[in-house]
Amino acid sequence: MKASWDIFCTVVDNFGDVGVTFRLARQLVAEHDMSVRLWVDDLSAFARLCPGADAQALQQWHDGVNVCFWAKDWQPAEPADVVIEAFACHLPGAYIDAMKARNPRPLWLNLEYLSAEEWVTGCHGLPSLQSSGIQKFFFFP
């Protein structure tokens, strides 16, 4: 059975956030045969990057990626095996609760921005125990 991945993306400025996360999602599908759901809070930004995308659709498929609208009023969703919190976005509390209840618990990664600063090497892969009791790991590309 292939692993499932959830990638959460808050569009902050321009299209970098959604562009990087969509590219990562497509690579996980195409190169590693993973099942990937990309949660995006601004589908209009996504639609400008992805020909054929519908900025109004709550769920749509592009290049094998299940692209879902990340609404402020979060609707319950089963957590994936691997969860990526991209670029310091914050997962919905109900999703974190569902992660805590899942057995085994998902691998939770905090994907950070690219940096060439020296301190990055010492922080890459570090665990961070969250108040939920789940470990989150920092990933610096």
Feature-to-residue mapping (PLM):
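Active-site and donor-binding regions of nucleotide-sugar-utilizing enzymes
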Residues: F8-G133
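A conserved mid-domain beta-alpha-beta active-site/ligand-binding segment of alpha/beta enzyme cores
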Residues: K136-P141
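Extreme N-terminal starter segment of soluble prokaryotic enzymes
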Residues: K2-D6
